[in-house]
Design a protein with these regions (language model features):
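Short glycine-aspartate micro-motif
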Residues: 3-5, 61, 71, 109-112
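Surface "functional belts" at beta-alpha junctions
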Residues: 22, 89-181, 212, 233
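Acyltransferase
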Residues: 175-233
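N-terminal beta-alpha supersecondary unit
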Residues: 1-64
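DPxDG-like acidic metal-binding loop motif
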Residues: 59-90, 95
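Short beta-strand scaffold segments in enzyme catalytic cores
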Residues: 13-18, 119-124, 206
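Residues at secondary-structure transition points
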Residues: 30-38, 69, 73, 77, ...
């Protein structure tokens, strides 16, 4: 089975390909271009380097978020299009769960992504990747308080961990290679979920909050859209 995984949750564009449970290609680019400019060429280039075509892919995997609103939309749209056009299954995976899976230690894992304004997307997972603290949008003060209440050594996973390390007295920063690229973890989790059924048309990004445009939308317009959604106009 050939699996293609995509992650556009952050500034890093990731495309990873596995064949028969072995990673054969892993392409990660942190650049100023938007994911819409870089992602499709990355997929095409990696397939070409491996001597493969898109028709050779049997299963697609997408990091569903949380993360960058724009990035998640782009990645999800491209992944769903590829799966639909080629008649293949798409498996959505939590970005935070994939980030936690970058570590295989017995310590509690605390994956975090920057949500700006002293806020983080975060969660806590045990050594078996069972969710201990629900992944959600938190202020760093609230999240660190919840983690510190556990009174255990934890691994801070994600590039934002270094910025907030002082908030976690028992927190350990992992080396750089643990903190961003999650393609291999997406493949690992997708293999575990490959027999589950996912409705392609019901797979959507997990933003964990409204977009800036939605938050700043005038109340009158919000009310009109809600009325329309409820069939009142």
């Amino acid at each position: 089975m050939n699996i293609l995984a995509i992650d556009t949750s952050t500034m890093i564009s990731t495309v990873t390909i596995a064949s028969n449970d072995e990673i054969i290609g892993d392409f990660n680019v942190n650049q100023q271009k938007t994911h819409s400019e870089s992602l499709v060429p990355m997929i095409e280039n990696l397939l070409n380097l491996l001597g493969m075509e898109i028709k050779d892919i049997d299963l697609y995997v997408i990091a569903k978020g949380p993360g960058s609103f724009t990035g998640l939309r782009i990645g999800m749209t491209i992944a769903k299009t590829l799966a639909q056009v080629n008649g293949k299954k798409l498996i959505p995976i939590s970005t935070l769960l994939a980030l936690a899976n970058n570590s295989s230690s017995d310590k509690l894992k605390v994956p975090m992504l920057d949500a700006r304004g002293n806020r983080v997307y975060g969660g806590v997972f045990d050594k078996d990747f069972k969710e201990i603290i629900k992944e959600d949008l938190y202020t760093i003060e609230d999240f660190s308080a919840l983690v510190n209440e556990l009174d255990q050594e934890v691994e801070l996973i994600g590039e934002i961990g270094k910025k907030y390390q002082d908030k976690f007295p028992k927190g350990k920063i992992l080396p750089l290679n643990f903190n961003n690229c999650i393609g291999k973890s997406l493949i690992k989790l997708a293999i575990a979920d490959k027999d589950k059924n996912f409705n392609l048309y019901e797979i959507i990004p997990n933003y964990l909050r409204k977009s800036q445009a939605e938050r700043e939308m005038p109340k009158e317009l919000k009310d009109r859209l809600n009325d329309k959604k409820n069939g009142q106009i």
